[in-house]
């Protein structure tokens, strides 16, 4: 079988799965219309509790499953490469942890549907979509050479998550430098260490970042299982 992607439905080919990508602004500003559109395209209707989760910009990472679908909420680190701008007229603001801002990206999965909800300007996701657009410009027979196209909603979801996890990996270098700095300060024997308040503050930051990463790992492990 030839696997390919298309923005339009091809009646002469079997639809393996459908991906619907949405901006949070569409969901927040036109909630009922968004739900209606999703239902018309996918047949999915989300329960009210999950709708609240999707609308909550501060919702922690989580994984939940119901009979009709699975829900995964991942918190992406906002990097300088992103173009995620907060609306000054909106009361919403992204969660900030010691200077590290995060934003939720939600995934609703079934065996043949993936619905994603993200902020406009999420650079890793936009880069991935650009790659798919480039692939769509090829002939159908050439799109999956070599075999790089996702063939299930879970496969696509994991690829999108992988593109965002790099933001957490990029924290390793600056955090390592800070740890080395404080080690040097503490081990200097020629003068008395007096920066306990700053050290305590940075230790709190390290603990919060560790907790955030552990939450993400636990959530992803549930999703993979």
Describe each PLM feature range.
Residues 24, 170, 176-177, 183:
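Generic hydrophobic/packing signal
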Residues 153, 157, 168-171, 188-198:
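Residue-level recognition of alpha-helical structural elements
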Residues 30-31, 46, 167, 191, ...:
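Residue-level preference for nonpolar/small residues embedded in alpha-helices
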Residues 112, 181-225:
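Membrane-associated alpha-helical segments
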Residues 1-147, 219-225:
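Helix-boundary and N-terminal cytosolic regulatory elements
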Residues 158-176, 200-203, 207-210, 214:
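Short amphipathic alpha-helical segments with heptad-repeat character
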Residues 139-164:
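Long, non-coiled-coil amphipathic alpha-helical linker/lever segments
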């Amino acid at each position: 079988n030839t696997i390919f992607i298309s923005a339009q439905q091809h009646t002469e080919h079997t639809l393996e799965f459908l991906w619907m990508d949405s901006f949070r602004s569409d969901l927040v500003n036109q909630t009922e219309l968004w739900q209606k559109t999703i239902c018309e395209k996918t047949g999915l209707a989300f329960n009210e509790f999950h709708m609240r989760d999707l609308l909550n910009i501060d919702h922690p990472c989580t994984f939940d499953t119901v009979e009709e679908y699975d829900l995964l909420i991942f918190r992406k680190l906002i990097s300088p490469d992103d173009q995620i701008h907060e609306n000054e007229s909106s009361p919403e603001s992204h969660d900030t942890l010691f200077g590290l801002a995060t934003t939720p990206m939600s995934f609703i999965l079934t065996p043949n549907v993936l619905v994603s909800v993200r902020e406009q300007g999420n650079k890793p996701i936009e880069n991935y979509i650009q790659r798919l657009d480039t692939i769509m410009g090829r002939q159908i027979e050439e799109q999956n050479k070599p075999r790089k196209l996702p063939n299930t909603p879970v496969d696509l979801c994991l690829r999108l998550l992988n593109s965002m996890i790099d933001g957490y990996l990029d924290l390793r270098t600056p955090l390592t430098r800070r740890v080395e700095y404080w080690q040097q300060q503490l081990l200097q024997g020629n003068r008395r260490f007096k920066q306990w308040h700053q050290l305590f503050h940075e230790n709190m930051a390290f603990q919060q970042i560790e907790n955030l990463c552990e939450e993400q790992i636990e959530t992803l492990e549930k999703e993979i299982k």
